[in-house]
Amino acid sequence: MVVSDMVLNDVVLSPFGATASEMLEAARCAEDSGFSAVMTYDHLTGAMLDRGHSNDPFVLLGAIAAVTETVRVGPLVANMMNRHPAQLAVAMASLQTLSSGRAVLGLGSGSAPGSRFAGEQETIGIELLDGPSRTRRLKESIQLVRQVWAGETSFRGEFFSIEEPGLQLDLASPPPIIIGASGRKTVQLALAHADGVNITSGPKLQELLDVVANHRSSTGFETSVHVPVSLDHPEGGELTEAERGQLDRRVLAFSAPFDLRAMAQIGQAINRK
């Protein structure tokens, strides 16, 4: 199934070991090179990867929004274990206003026990949940974020609640919600409750793309893949014809120190088509 005639290309900038000025320079380069979105990760530290410090995603995204004009901006993905969904809703409403409607909210369910980023949650005393609990929490988080954006003033669920008088937001239109997924159940949750899914590249990619193709009911549902950039490849890496036919967007991951020359060359090669 062909979703679109052309796959849009985005970048996600790793905050690990990068300065704020390097992130902003890379964001401007990405926009100038024709990329459609500039995203960043939501991590407290890069220590688990021996990459040193991280950067707060929403501080950086606000700055990126201020120095760009056309690209979409947002976290890929916001870790739902790091903050209350109401706090996330307020942060994204601010980013949507600051960016003049260019914000997109990527959401993830948090680290699994024993995974490489589990220590990040343990460091600040956040409980590690099993898979079914994380799935329920993510579903409830989506519901609560949407309700806060809609101006509803109370909510009570399994994991979260808000009470009267609620929250007042300056939000003309809500950002789309994209779920980060590496497994079938999360893809199915995205199909049921979100505006799109961002699938991690790997052995299951085609299987998960087929799940989307067989079950998506909305023509507006957006399918993207997250892949590490290949700086030695003129187009940043390969997509098979089957993958290209099932994707709306490809998100290339760049790490610091950012090779802006390579970013520009790749962007000019793939975004002029």
Q: Where are the predicted features?
A:
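Active-site-adjacent structural elements that line small-molecule/cofactor binding pockets in enzymes
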Residues: 1-273
